[in-house]
């Protein structure tokens, strides 16, 4: 037979698992205090004397050992723990000694809270921030036409514009630099390239003035950049063909067995080379040697203009080829 159950069952006890409430209760019942911002020279005996009005049972100053190659030394952590007879004495010490001055430092005194993994505070999630591109406002004309556009097409256009803008900006920056109508830039020339080699390479386009110089390019990240020097030249031509066409044709040919780069020269590069030549006196020396060019120097026997790397009659007047600079211009790009 079944027994009749009582209509008044005993109350069920429900435990409160709130970590914050438990830690607060533990702190109220603890007999230990935690002291921070302590002077590193403080000793346990000095703290016992400082806390004597509250009858501490023990004082602990934690430290750690710093191990060196030849010796070890103990370094305090700047904190201390003190135990008292009752929780009331501990709370009394906290209320009286917090923010008091001890050895020219304001002590931070509070009740000790035992460590528990549940009491560890989790870091708050960082707010998500939109990129500058997504925060940027749409132009007024796009806002006016937003209602009539397909949302899928609009999103595709925005993604395409975001990916193409950096490249287009770089190309526009390059196109903005003006180029010469009669001068080409030859890069990555062989180290021993001479004036005669370049005149032979561009013989179909009547080369006039030639500047051979060294330039420098940096590769790699900023903190590990490797600087590579290479030979380049500026060549002024007298031809009905456009400079772009000449650069396209001559880029397919090799000089001394090496493929080179030929493109229209930037006017700023031409001005830079000539300015350095004027500063170093190269243009004046070439002007002085204008009539000292042999008929077989590669320019049809005509006197060389300023900066033409012809063959002087006096070998001692020729530029130093060890620097790969003819006629003596050294440019660092």
Swiss-Prot record:
Ranges of compositional bias, category Basic residues: 125-137
Which protein family is it in? Belongs to the RRT5 family.
Pfam family example for this protein? RRM_1
Q: Which UniProt keywords apply?
A: Repeat, RNA-binding, Transcription, Transcription regulation
Q: Which residues form the RRM domain?
A: 31-114, 182-267
Biased segments, Gly residues type? 298-308
Its biological function? May be involved in the modulation of rDNA transcription.
Name the UniProt record assigns to this protein: Regulator of rDNA transcription protein 5
**What organism is the protein native to?**
Vanderwaltozyma polyspora (strain ATCC 22028 / DSM 70294 / BCRC 21397 / CBS 2163 / NBRC 10782 / NRRL Y-8283 / UCD 57-17) (Kluyveromyces polysporus)
Q: Where does the source fall among the domains of life?
A: Eukaryota
SUPFAM superfamilies (alphabetical): RNA-binding domain, RBD
Q: Which GO terms describe its molecular function?
A: RNA binding
């Amino acid at each position: 037979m079944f027994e009749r159950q009582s209509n008044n069952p005993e109350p069920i006890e429900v435990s409160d698992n709130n970590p914050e409430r438990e830690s607060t209760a533990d702190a109220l019942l603890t007999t230990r205090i935690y002291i921070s911002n302590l002077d590193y020279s403080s000793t346990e005996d000095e703290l016992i004397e400082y806390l004597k009005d509250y009858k501490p049972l023990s004082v602990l100053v934690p430290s750690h050992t710093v191990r060196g190659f030849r010796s070890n030394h103990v370094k305090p952590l700047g904190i201390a723990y003190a135990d008292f007879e009752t929780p009331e004495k501990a709370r009394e010490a906290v209320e009286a000694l917090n923010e008091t001055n001890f050895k020219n430092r304001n002590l931070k005194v509070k009740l000790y809270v035992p460590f528990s993994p549940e009491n560890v505070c989790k870091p708050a999630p960082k707010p998500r921030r939109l990129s500058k591109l997504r925060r940027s406002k749409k132009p007024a004309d796009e806002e006016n036409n937003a209602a009539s556009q397909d949302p899928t097409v609009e999103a595709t256009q925005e993604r395409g514009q975001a990916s193409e803008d950096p490249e287009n900006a770089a190309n526009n920056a390059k196109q903005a630099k003006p180029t010469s109508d009669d001068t080409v830039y030859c890069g990555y020339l062989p180290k021993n390239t001479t004036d005669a080699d370049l005149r032979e390479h561009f013989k179909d386009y009547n080369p006039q003035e030639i500047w051979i110089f060294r330039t420098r390019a940096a590769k790699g990240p900023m903190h590990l950049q490797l600087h590579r020097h290479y030979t380049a030249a500026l060549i002024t031509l007298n031809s009905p063909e456009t400079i772009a066409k000449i650069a396209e044709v001559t880029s397919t040919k090799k000089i001394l067995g090496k493929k080179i780069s030929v493109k229209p020269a930037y006017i700023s590069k031409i001005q830079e080379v000539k300015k350095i030549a004027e500063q170093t006196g190269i243009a004046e020396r070439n002007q002085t040697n204008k009539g000292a060019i042999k008929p077989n120097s590669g320019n049809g026997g005509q006197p060389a203009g300023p900066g033409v790397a012809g063959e002087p009659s006096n070998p001692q007047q020729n530029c130093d080829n060890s620097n790969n600079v003819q006629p003596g211009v050294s440019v660092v790009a």
